């Protein structure tokens, strides 16, 4: 029989790597930089195909929880049970490499501007608890782990969201950036931070922002020793009545802007625990704390602060503020500082050092309770903006502007807007040589019957929009001393001047592009804001009406030579660029 005729036996060839142990499969656990309790860097066990350990004992390296990987670079994770056995089963010898679990919680995604943990909180959650208890196997996993090693798990227990390490005594590690962590959780009634380690956190910006249903918040578990940013941390937590700040270590904090803004439930606030020696920004820190009746600023070190914009804004129940503890020598921005402090009846500005301040826009806006305001202590040599500085100060009956140095001011729009209690206003002290914006300057000064405008230097002004709007009692306005070569906007300039009889517009309007509703209009709810009593109008040879809706009062206007011109209440036939005085009768 030849070789070709010999029968070929049926042989099955296995390519599987044979086990190095005849009893079963060997799993070698590599410490991968960690050492096992016996001092070795490796530990072996032998198991059979059903997962029964035949020899050896599973151990954890380094006395810490680890995640096992199929490679030493720890890129290919393998899920194991509590005995260290792969959940996928065992079919050959295995080498597993350890990597310590970090227990790191998901955090702020700066590139997308959202907090990944916040996005995990179900809309049904009414409480949040950080714990170390084991997750029930019956509950659905919420993956709250930052690096995928399974160190942090979360689940819902009724309406309570629990976040856990599942290892007794092991805390969850908060990410370094906790911005927006609990942002806008408007249904959450309580947050238990007991098992959250914040020792590595540097930013707590907007951490509890608009947690409107919180009535209490225990800050004791928080380690804030490395935090530099607490901006808007408790913003809008309007139902918290009292907040104990004593657990907070603020030694390294530089930004406290809006920290308590909108905490309208606060009736008291003890600032004693706060170390503010490194803080540079306190803008809006107490804004909207509308139930505070008193605030002791003594504990605050403000020697490095540069921004106090809106610091007391809308603290409407404060009747007085002792500013003596404040060191303001480095402040550049005091805009909105007392805005909306409608309960203030007196305000001593003497303690304020304003030598470096450039912005005092809206500084006293809507301080309706002030009847007098002594400005003599203010140094405004560097100020460039005074927009709406006294707007809405309807209680002021007199205002001495003598102390104000306005030589560098460019914006005084709305500076006296709504000062309805003023019956007289001396503008002589104002140096307006650099001012470009006078819009709304006297708007709503309904107590003025006359106003001497000759002190105003308007050569650089571009906007006179609504400049005298709603000066409802003023009888005569003469702007013949105005240089209006740069003015482009006279929109609604005189609207609401219901008592105005005489108007001198002996100015140059060659660059004005809008006069819409200059002489008034009718509001949506039917209020008539036209200058219906205007009967005397003087114009220059460089004055021209712009557009067709400036709304000069309707009627017949007679020139000095008796020539009659008409206005239909929108536009008129009075000739442009012809100096004359017109009388309506």
Region locations from a protein language model:
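Short glycine-aromatic motifs
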Residues: 34-35, 63-66, 125, 240, ...
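N-terminal capping/linker segments that flank leucine-rich repeat
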Residues: 3-33, 94-184, 193, 505-508, ...
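Short aromatic-glycine motifs in intrinsically disordered, low-complexity regions
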Residues: 53-63, 516-522, 526-528
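Secondary-structure capping and domain/repeat boundary segments
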Residues: 2-101
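Structural signature of tandem-repeat unit edges
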Residues: 43-46, 128, 158-173, 186-202, ...
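Short beta-strand elements of solenoid repeat domains
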Residues: 206-210, 232-236, 258-262, 284-288, ...
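Surface-exposed intrinsically disordered loops and tails
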Residues: 80-84, 527, 568
């Amino acid at each position: 029989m030849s070789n070709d005729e010999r029968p070929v036996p049926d042989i099955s060839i296995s390519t599987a790597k044979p086990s190095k142990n005849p009893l079963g499969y060997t799993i070698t656990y590599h410490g991968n930089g960690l050492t096992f309790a016996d001092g070795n860097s490796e530990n072996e066990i032998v198991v059979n195909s059903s997962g029964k350990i035949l020899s050896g004992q599973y151990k954890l390296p380094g006395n810490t929880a680890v995640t096992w990987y199929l490679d030493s670079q720890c890129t290919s994770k393998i899920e194991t049970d509590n005995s260290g056995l792969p959940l996928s089963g065992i079919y050959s010898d295995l080498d597993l490499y350890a990597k310590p679990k970090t227990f790191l919680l998901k955090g702020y995604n700066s590139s997308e501007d959202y907090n990944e943990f916040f996005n995990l909180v179900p809309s049904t959650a009414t409480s949040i608890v950080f714990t170390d208890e084991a997750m029930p196997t019956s509950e659905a996993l919420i993956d709250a782990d930052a690096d995928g090693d399974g160190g942090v798990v979360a689940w819902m227990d009724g309406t309570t969201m629990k976040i856990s390490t599942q290892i007794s005594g092991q805390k969850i590690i908060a990410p370094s950036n906790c911005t927006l962590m609990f942002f806008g959780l408007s249904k959450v009634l309580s947050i238990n931070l007991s098992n959250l380690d914040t020792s590595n956190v540097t930013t707590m910006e907007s951490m509890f922002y608009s947690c409107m249903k919180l009535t209490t918040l225990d800050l004791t578990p928080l380690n804030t020793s490395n935090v530099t940013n607490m901006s808007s941390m408790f913003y809008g937590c309007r139902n918290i009545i009292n907040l104990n700040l004593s657990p907070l270590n603020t030694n390294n904090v530089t930004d406290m802007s809006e920290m308590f803004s909108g905490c309208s439930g606060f009736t008291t606030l003890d600032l004693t625990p706060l170390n503010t020696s490194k803080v540079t920004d306190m803008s809006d820190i107490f804004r909207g704390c509308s139930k505070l009746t008193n605030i002791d600023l003594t504990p605050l070190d403000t020697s490095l602060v540069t921004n106090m914009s809106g610091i007391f804004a809308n603290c409407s129940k404060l009747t007085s503020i002792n500013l003596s503890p404040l060191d303001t020598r480095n402040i550049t921005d005091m805009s909105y500082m007392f805005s909306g402090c409608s309960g203030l009846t007196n305000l001593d500005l003497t303690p304020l050092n304003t030598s470096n301040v450039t912005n005092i826009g809206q500084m006293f806006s809507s301080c309706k309770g002030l009847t007098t305001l002594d400005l003599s202590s203010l140094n405004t040599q560097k100020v460039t903006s005074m927009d709406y500085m006294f707007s809405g100060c309807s209680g002021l009956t007199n205002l001495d502007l003598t102390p104000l140095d306005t030589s560098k001011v460019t914006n005084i729009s709305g500076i006296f807007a709504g000062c309805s209690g003023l019956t007289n206003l001396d503008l002589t002290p104002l140096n307006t040589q650099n001012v470009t914006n006078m819009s709304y300057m006297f708007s709503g000064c309904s107590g003025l019957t006359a106003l001497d405008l000759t002190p105003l230097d308007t050569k650089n002004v571009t906007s006179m929009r609504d400049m005298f709007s709603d000066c409802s009692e003023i009888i005569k306005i003469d702007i013949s001393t105005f240089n209006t070569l740069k003015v482009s906007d006279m929109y609604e300039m005189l609207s609401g001047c219901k008592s105005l009889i005489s108007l001198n517009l002996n100015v140059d309007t060659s660059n004005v592009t809008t006069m819409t509703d200059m002489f008034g209009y009718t509001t949506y709810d039917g209020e008539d804001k036209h200058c219906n009593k205007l009967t005397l109008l003087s114009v220059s040879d460089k004055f021209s009406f712009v557009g067709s809706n400036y709304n000069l009062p309707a009627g017949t206007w007679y020139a000095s030579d008796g020539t009659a011109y008409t206005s239909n209440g929108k536009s008129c036939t009075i000739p442009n660029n012809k100096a004359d005085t017109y009388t309506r009768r």
